[in-house]
C-alpha cells in the first residue's frame, strides 16, 4: 500500500515540475535478519528460499518466534548472529546478502506488474557504516545517555519517552539508521521536501526521530 501511495505522490510532484527522487527504503537490516538466519540454519531449505523467497523468509521468522517460546536460548543465538552481521562476519553477510537478493527479485517482479520504478534501493543496510558518525555526534552534543549498558536519548520532557539508540550489545536500531538516512539524503540531494510514506503505527518513532534531529541542530528536520 505504501508503495502505491508513494508512487502516486511521485506522479503529482513530477507533474508539478519537481525533480523527484524515488527511494525504496528497504527494511533489509536489523535483528529480524538474525532471527531469519538462525531459523534457516535450524530448519531451512535452499530451494524453498529460491522458489518463494518472501513466503519462505516470513515463514522462518514465524517459525523462530514459535520455537523461541519453547527454546529461549534461540533468542541469544539470533542476537549473536546479528552482532556478527554488523561486524561483517563473512558467513552471516553471505546469508544476509542472499536473502536480500532473492527478496528483491520478487519485489521487482511485483513492482514491474504495478508499473512502479525507483531511483534508489538504498535501505537500512546502506547506512550501517554511516551510523557511528551520528552516535558520536549525539554523544558530543550531550544528547546521549547510558542506561543499563545501552545508549538512549531522553525525550521525556517533550512527551516522547525515551529513544533507544544502541542496545547493550552495541547493535543499532531502526531509529539510528533513520537518523543516518535523513542526513545522508540532505547532504546528497539537498532536498526541498523529504516525504516518508509509512504506517500510522510508526507515529511515535518518527516524532522521536524528528525531535532528535532538531536537537542535533538540523533545522530542516521539521
Q: What does each model-found stretch correspond to?
A:
Residues 1-222:
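NTP-dependent nucleotidyl-transfer catalytic core
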Amino acid at each position: 500500500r505504501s508503495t502505491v501511495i508513494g508512487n502516486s505522490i511521485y506522479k503529482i510532484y513530477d507533474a508539478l515540475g519537481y525533480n523527484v527522487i524515488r527511494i525504496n527504503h528497504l527494511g533489509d537490516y536489523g535483528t529480524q535478519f538474525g532471527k531469519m538466519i538462525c531459523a534457516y540454519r535450524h530448519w531451512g531449505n535452499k530451494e524453498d528460499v529460491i522458489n518463494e523467497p518472501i513466503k519462505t523468509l516470513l515463514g522462518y521468522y514465524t517459525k523462530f518466534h514459535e520455537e523461541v517460546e519453547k527454546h529461549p536460548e534461540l533468542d541469544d543465538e539470533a542476537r549473536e548472529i546479528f552482532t556478527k552481521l554488523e561486524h561483517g562476519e563473512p558467513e552471516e553477510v553471505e546469508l544476509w546478502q542472499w536473502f536480500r537478493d532473492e527478496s528483491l527479485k520478487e519485489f521487482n517482479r511485483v513492482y514491474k506488474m504495478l508499473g512502479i520504478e525507483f531511483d534508489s534501493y538504498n535501505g537500512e543496510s546502506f547506512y550501517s557504516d554511516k551510523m557511528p558518525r551520528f552516535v558520536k555526534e549525539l554523544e558530543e552534543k550531550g544528547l546521549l545517555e547510558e542506561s543499563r549498558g545501552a545508549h538512549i536519548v531522553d525525550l521525556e520532557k517533550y512527551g516522547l519517552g525515551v529513544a533507544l539508540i544502541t542496545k547493550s550489545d552495541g547493535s543499532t536500531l531502526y531509529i539510528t539508521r533513520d537518523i543516518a538516512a535523513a542526513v545522508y539524503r540532505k547532504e546528497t540531494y539537498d532536498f526541498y521536501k523529504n516525504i516518508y510514506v509509512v504506517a500510522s503505527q510508526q507515529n511515535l518513532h518518527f516524532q522521536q526521530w524528528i525531535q532528535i534531529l532538531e536537537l542535533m541542530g538540523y533545522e530542516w528536520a521539521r
